[in-house]
Every structure is written in structure tokens, then in C-alpha cells.
Amino acid sequence: MTQQHPLMRLVNSTSLVSQILVGLVFGILLAMFMPEWAKAAGLLGSLFVGALKAVAPLLVFVLVMAAIIGHKQGQKSNMKPILLLYLLGTFLAAAVAVVASFLFPSNLHLVASSAEITPPGGITEVLQTLLFNVVTNPVKALMDANYIGILAWAIGLGIAMRHANDSTKAMITDLSHGVSTIVKAVIRCAPLGILGLVASTLAETGFDALFGYAHLLVVLIGCMLFIAFVVNPIIVFWKIRRNPYPLVLTCLKESGVTAFFTRSSAANIPVNMTLCEKLRLPEDTYAVSIPLGATINMAGAAITITVLSMAAVHTLGMEVDLATAVLLSVVATISACGASGVAGGSLLLIPLACSLFGIGNDIAMQVVAVGFIIGVLQDSAETALNSSTDVLFTAAACMAEDETLLDAASLPSREA
């Protein structure tokens, strides 16, 4: 038997999270001492994110179809409680952001102009975009990574093929296993990818631009941390009636860390799928809930929309009553659920929230420009919260139905 190379033995015996942390440290050191090399290392990050984005649409399509074809009559899918948790978590995130904005008001130094970008005209347009995403061409949905369209076609084909021959079902199941194997291989490259992402980001932008918006960033990221470590654990405890923190910390470590650096919920779908498998969750549940969560579970986006809109209000010296604040929370929740259907995501939905207070589009777009300036941290933290919560709520809903899964909550941290 061929003896394994010592370096490969070290890599295989070290957890993926530990390898990612090593990649993070090397990325920072590379940016500090060899900025030109750091910019070149950005290729590793781009390749990693590109590979994840390339495989994610096919993974979702095949897994969802295979899960529905293999679904047995009378078997629970837990989708209703998961959807409830997604909406509840997003609304509470918006409400926390409103309270934080009242307690710690932020003032913006509005910039002169913003990029040539077109925000949605209203809540109707956001919902209309989502509906049209459902009825899109399946090939176009796969090419554009339109997960609403992919889900719609995968569910439709899955239901239509429930009574197909066993050989057809076996072929689709084998195909899903094949795609999953490719995904696992891509995820093993995460340390190199994150090294490249961190090194190039620090070398090209640095953090100088962030210091002028330190207060705003503290409020934004403080809200996200409060949701991650206080509100979400309370929601999980309500579902499973056990100490929620082992599960919360596992999701943040296994999913949140990768999402923070890739800054893409779609790219993190394969990572979340792998974590769900480690937690031994039912595949027919997480195959649907994870890509759906990447589309509509947007607690981080709700915080971004609310905090930046309230910052604009405070900057202009406007008074906000309780009823308007509650309405802002509702609008932010609905808008956040449609953030994935808007080019530019949560930042371009800020003008929609600002319109509640009669703030003109010119000023609102300047607030959007501020969002782009702080995006290095804001977008990373937002994605980490959004994506890790997808797994957290899926696991909580499944564990509430099947208590035997509770023991699996700490497995990934031991096995990784």
C-alpha cells in the first residue's frame, strides 16, 4: 500500500475550519507585506467562488428533483415550520434594527453621487420580479442561477416523475450523488479560495474607507451579532426545548465563516447542503429549504435596509413615530425576501424603504453609495448571517419533529 505524503496526511487530519483560519491568516499577511502578490492571489478566490456558483444551480435542481421523486406518502417534509421560522427571523431582525437605530442613531456624510444603478420602483415591482422568476425558462433559470425558477421546475418535474420507472428514479438519485461528490471536492478548496479572497480584498481596498463610517458599521454589525447570538438561539430554543448554542455555534462555524468570505448565499448553498448531511437532516427537507432560504431568508438584508434607511432619516433630522417604525419593519421584511431577485441585493432596496419617509431618490441613492463603501464588511456579515440561519432554522424544525437528531448537532465540530 502506498504511504501517504506527510503534507497530505496533515491536510486530511486537520479540520476544514482550521484550514480556513490558516488561509485567512496567510491572506492577511500576504496583503500586508506583498500587496502585488496578494492581488494576484485574488485569482484563487475568484476561481473558488466561480466553482461554487457554477455547481450550485445544478446541485439544487438535481437534489430537489431527486428528493421529491423519492418522497414517500405520509412522510413529513417540515417545510411549513421552516418557512414560518424564515419569516419570523427576518421580521425580528428588522424590528431589532429599528430599535437599535433609535437607541444609537447614525449620521451619514452623504457622498456626491452613486453608481448608475436602478432600484425597484416599489414593493409591487419586487413581488412582480419574484413571480416572473417562477415562470422563467428552465435552461435560462439554470444559466442565470435563478433559484426561484430552478426550485419551481425541480419541484414540478419531481412531482410529475413520482410514478416513473424505478430505473429512472435510480438514475436521478445517482446523478444527485455524483453532483454532491463534485461539490465536496470544491469545498475542500475553501482554504485556498479564502486566502485569495482576503488577500486581494485587503490589498485592493484596505479598510481606510471604513473608518469614516465606524459608528454605522458598529450598529449594523452589532444588530447582526445580536440576531445571531441572542434572537436566533431564543427561536431555536422555542422549537427544540434544549440548549440551542451547540447548534448555533456549529452553523456559524461551518456555514457562516465560508459565507463571510464568499459574500454569496448562492455560492454557500453547497456548503450548507454538506452541513445538513453531517447533521443527518432528512434530504427531502433540506434539498428544498436551503436553496429556498438562500432566496427568501434574509435577516441580514432586513437589518441593512432598516439601519441605512433610519440613518438617512436621522441625517435629515426627521421624526419617526412608532407606527411608521413598525411599518418600516414590515416593508423591510418583504423587501428582504425579494432581495435576491434584485441586482445589487439589499442595498438597492434602500430607496424603497426611504420612500416611506418621503425621502427623494437622489438622497436615497447617496445612501446606497454609502452602503457600497462599507460593503466589504457589511455584505460579508450580512451573507454570513443569512446563510448560516438557513441551516440553523432547517435543523431546528427537523429536530423539533425528530428528537433523535438532537445528538447530531455537535457532530460536525468533532468530525470535521
From Swiss-Prot:
Subcellular location, record wording: Cell inner membrane
Signal peptide positions (record): none
UniProt keyword Cell inner membrane, yes or no: yes
Pfam families for the chain: SDF
GO CC annotations, alphabetized: plasma membrane
Positions of transmembrane segments: 15-35, 49-69, 82-102, 141-161, 192-212, 217-237, 288-308, 330-350, 356-376
Topology of the protein relative to the lipid bilayer: Multi-pass membrane protein
Keyword field: Amino-acid transport, Cell inner membrane, Cell membrane, Membrane, Symport, Transmembrane, Transmembrane helix, Transport
Protein family: Belongs to the dicarboxylate/amino acid:cation symporter (DAACS) (TC 2.A.23) family.
Biological function: Involved in the import of serine and threonine into the cell, with the concomitant import of sodium (symport system).
Protein name, UniProt field: Serine/threonine transporter SstT
Organism: Aeromonas salmonicida (strain A449)
